[in-house]
Each structure stands twice: as structure tokens, then as C-alpha cells.
């Protein structure tokens, strides 16, 4: 671990205290996990604390952990992952917060702390169904208003639920149930030891 990362780790532990659930270092990056009830206050500390000063929200996205890793995931299903940048100190941190309810995932909105979170949170809502409490305009951003479900959830069917087509009799685009038969895709398994090595 570099001196810079050691300083960042120490500053994070001191500033966040009990709000910090875990801190891991991998591939030269620090990832912290905070509880959903502490999310807003922890993010405000990350932005305002003099030893941290994470002024920029670089990215925010939703994650569905239902089939993460080699088997079934045993923790909460949905998380929001944010990437923050401190211009003052020239360091970065990844913040992960898990929604406490898998059926109705809700976390606090970051739009009051970083206005740039607006469209990121709308995208996470649109694709994963994660609700952001306090967001003043939480609506779909990339799928159409009649879209059913959230397409980045791992239990969403690959073919979707409805398809659009132009109806010449009605002279407009209409929705109809998907006409594709669902099937299970089996990954190709290559058993030859030296396959593709020649």
C-alpha cells in the first residue's frame, strides 16, 4: 500500500468512525461500505471533512448482486455504488451502500450534496428499480414510459415482456406481448487443453 492510500484510509476511518461498515483495498483503490441509514450523513462527511474533501461525484450506478460470484449471493440484493474524487487531495474512493429491502430497494438521494447525481439516480431507478428518497424528479430516463419492469435486474427476461411494432391499420406503433419463445442459453464449453493456443 502506498503512503497516499495509507493517509486516505486513516482519514476515512477517523472521519467516518462508526458509519464505516467496511473498508477494503484492491488494485490500488479503496472501497468503503456504509449502512443505508447512514448513507446521506456519511456522504456529506466525505464531501465536507477537511481531511477528505471529495468535491466531485464522478459516477453513481446500481448493482444487482443476486447471482454475484460463484454462487447465490447471501447479502442484500441491490446496492448503489458511487465513485468520488477529491481535487484538493488528488484521491478517489468508491462508496457502496446496500438497500435494506430487496423487494422495494430505497436509499437516500445525493442530489442535494452533488447535483450531478440527478441523472445517475434516474438511470439506476430506470434500470434497477432502486428508489432514491428525496429525489425531486425520479422518473424513467432511457426506457419509454410504458416500459414494464427494470431491464438490468438479473431476473428480467432477456427478451423482455412486450415488443413494439408498427401497425399499418392503426397507423401507429403498438405494443404486443413478446412473440419470442423463452429458452435457456447454454454457454459453450471447450474441453481441449490447448484449444486456441496454436
Curated annotation (Swiss-Prot):
Functional description taken from the UniProt entry: NDH-1 shuttles electrons from NADH, via FMN and iron-sulfur (Fe-S) centers, to quinones in the respiratory chain. The immediate electron acceptor for the enzyme in this species is believed to be ubiquinone. Couples the redox reaction to proton translocation (for every two electrons transferred, four hydrogen ions are translocated across the cytoplasmic membrane), and thus conserves the redox energy in a proton gradient.
Protein name, UniProt field: NADH-quinone oxidoreductase subunit C
PROSITE patterns tied to this protein: COMPLEX1_30K
InterPro entries cross-referenced by the UniProt entry: NADH_DH_suC (IPR010218), NADH_quin_OxRdtase_su_C/D-like (IPR037232), NADH_UbQ_OxRdtase_30kDa_su (IPR001268), NADH_UbQ_OxRdtase_CS (IPR020396)
Lineage start: Bacteria, Pseudomonadati, Pseudomonadota, Betaproteobacteria, Burkholderiales
UniProt entry tagged with the keyword Repeat: no
Top EC group: translocase
Gene Ontology MF term list: NADH dehydrogenase (ubiquinone) activity; NADH:ubiquinone reductase (non-electrogenic) activity; quinone binding
Subcellular location as annotated: Cell inner membrane
Residue ranges the record marks as coiled coil: none
Membrane topology annotation: Peripheral membrane protein
Reaction catalysed by this enzyme: a quinone + NADH + 5 H(+)(in) = a quinol + NAD(+) + 4 H(+)(out)
GO cellular component: plasma membrane
Source taxon at top rank: Bacteria
The enzyme's E.C. designation: 7.1.1.-
Family to which the UniProt record says this protein belongs: Belongs to the complex I 30 kDa subunit family.
The entry's keywords: Cell inner membrane, Cell membrane, Membrane, NAD, Quinone, Translocase, Transport, Ubiquinone
Subunit-level organization: NDH-1 is composed of 14 different subunits. Subunits NuoB, C, D, E, F, and G constitute the peripheral sector of the complex.
Amino acid at each position: 500500500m502506498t503512503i497516499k492510500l495509507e493517509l486516505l484510509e486513516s482519514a476515512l476511518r477517523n472521519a467516518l468512525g462508526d458509519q464505516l461498515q467496511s473498508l477494503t483495498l484492491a488494485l490500488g483503490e479503496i472501497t468503503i461500505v456504509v449502512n443505508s441509514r447512514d448513507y446521506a450523513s456519511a456522504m456529506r462527511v466525505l464531501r465536507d471533512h477537511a481531511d477528505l474533501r471529495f468535491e466531485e461525484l464522478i459516477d453513481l450506478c446500481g448493482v444487482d448482486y443476486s447471482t454475484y460470484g460463484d454462487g447465490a449471493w447471501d447479502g442484500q440484493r441491490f446496492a448503489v455504488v458511487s465513485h468520488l474524487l477529491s481535487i484538493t487531495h488528488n484521491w478517489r474512493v468508491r462508496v457502496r451502500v446496500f438497500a435494506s429491502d430487496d423487494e422495494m430497494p430505497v436509499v437516500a438521494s445525493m442530489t442535494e450534496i452533488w447535483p450531478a447525481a440527478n441523472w445517475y439516480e434516474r438511470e439506476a431507478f430506470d434500470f434497477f428499480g432502486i428508489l432514491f428518497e428525496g429525489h425531486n424528479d425520479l422518473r424513467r430516463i432511457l426506457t419509454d414510459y410504458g416500459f414494464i419492469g427494470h431491464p438490468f435486474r438479473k431476473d428480467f427476461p432477456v427478451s423482455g415482456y412486450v415488443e413494439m411494432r408498427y401497425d399499418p391499420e392503426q397507423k401507429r406503433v403498438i405494443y404486443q406481448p413478446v412473440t419470442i419463445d423463452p429458452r435457456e442459453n447454454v454457454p459453450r464449453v471447450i474441453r481441449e487443453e490447448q484449444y486456441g493456443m496454436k
